[in-house]
Amino acid sequence: MTNVFHHVRNFIEQQPAPAKTLEKSSSPNILYTALPKHWRSNKSFQEPFYVVLLTPVPDNTEVSIWAGNDEKPCEEVRNEKAKVHRQVAKFNDLRFVGRSGRGRKFHLTIVIHSAPMMVATVKNVIKVTVDGPRDARIPKPQGSLKRQAEQQTIFPNDIIRTPGPPMPMTMIPPPWFPLPMTQTFPPSFFPLISPGPHPSISAALWKIHSESMKTPIKQKVEQENVSLNTSTCLSSPSIFITPTSDDRKLKRPSSPRSITKSSETSINLIQETPESVESKRRRNVSITSSNSSSPTIWRPF
């Protein structure tokens, strides 16, 4: 018995670090080296497969391996036989040719042909398929999605991950709040805002945001529209005849006095701005120049 433990100890010390892990079987006297969880059909393993015996067994005793499950009780295994040498049976090129099936694994049966015969079984040892272990056909990069979600957040990670009381509803900014920090914001704008419910802050921020988004072309167009609205019309003002209440009762045409009175009340005199005066002069000059060159053609500009 002392020789058995001596041989087993020497075997474990001589093996590299990955092969030192021995798995237990249904028999306490039979151990085996770990196998991969998933493997390809008819492919040799990277490391030899060992069966270690803790009971004294003479050398050159045959050890065989059987594989199967509920659907396939006995599948083909190549190089499934080995000889015992110093309590260790080494399988150099063990291959599982049969396939365990979809979602199923092989049960392993280790048989030591000694007197008496010893049998050990291990359930759900290895899964054998045609392709072997491979990546999914439609990968789901969960890590990249999480990174994109973190990048889309408006707050830094240290603020989000720190545990603390929930933020009150009055302090949560609207979705358009993260504006670019440009020259449109004066330096003294942010210190003026104190924490607390301010109903006029959102309107002020929206106004500042809309003004900051205006382009030079848009501002120029707005200025031109304002100048056109305030400029005076060169054509003669139209005279509106508004019948009085007496005329309506008598059903007679309105008098010339009412015509003059209505014309005075209907015409609104607009104060001329420097821009409107310049535009008026420009139009007058263009009219005179066009009359001097060709009196039949009128050129507004």
Swiss-Prot record:
Modifications after synthesis and translation: May be ubiquitinated in order to be targeted for proteasome-mediated degradation in intestinal cells.
Binding annotation for chloride: 99, 130
Gene Ontology MF annotations: ATP binding; DNA-binding transcription activator activity, RNA polymerase II-specific; DNA-binding transcription factor activity, RNA polymerase II-specific; RNA polymerase II cis-regulatory region sequence-specific DNA binding; sequence-specific DNA binding; SMAD binding
Disulfide bonding pattern of the chain: none
GO cellular component, one term: core-binding factor complex
Subcellular location, record wording: Nucleus
Segments of this protein annotated with the region Disordered: 237-301
Composition-biased stretches (Low complexity): 285-301
Biased amino acid composition, Polar residues: 255-276
Coiled coil: none
Keyword terms of this UniProt record: Developmental protein, Nucleus, Phosphoprotein, Transcription, Transcription regulation, Ubl conjugation
Modified residues (Phosphoserine): 255
Primary location: nucleus
Knockout or disruption consequences: RNAi-mediated knockdown causes embryonic lethality and missing male-specific sense organs, known as rays. In hermaphrodites, RNAi-mediated knockdown causes a slight (5%) reduction in body length at adulthood.
Annotated Runt domain residues: 10-138
Chain spans, region Interaction with DNA: 40-44, 95-103, 128-137
Any one GO BP annotation for this protein: positive regulation of stem cell proliferation
Tissues showing expression: Expressed in the intestine.
Assembly and oligomerization: Interacts with CBFbeta homolog bro-1; acts to increase the affinity and specificity of interaction of rnt-1 with DNA. Interacts with TGF-beta pathway protein sma-4.
Primary role: Transcription factor. Binds to regulatory DNA sequences in order to modulate transcription; negatively autoregulates its own expression, perhaps dependent upon CBF beta homolog bro-1. Promotes proliferation, and prevents differentiation, of seam cells, a stem cell-like lineage, acting in concert with bro-1. Required for controlling cell proliferation in the seam cells, perhaps by repressing expression of cyclin-dependent kinase inhibitor cki-1. Inhibition of seam cell differentiation is regulated by rnt-1 and bro-1, perhaps acting upstream of pop-1, by antagonizing pop-1 repressor function.
PANTHER family xrefs: RUNT RELATED, SEGMENTATION PROTEIN RUNT
Identification of the protein by name: Runt-related transcription factor rnt-1
Source organism: Caenorhabditis elegans
Gene: rnt-1
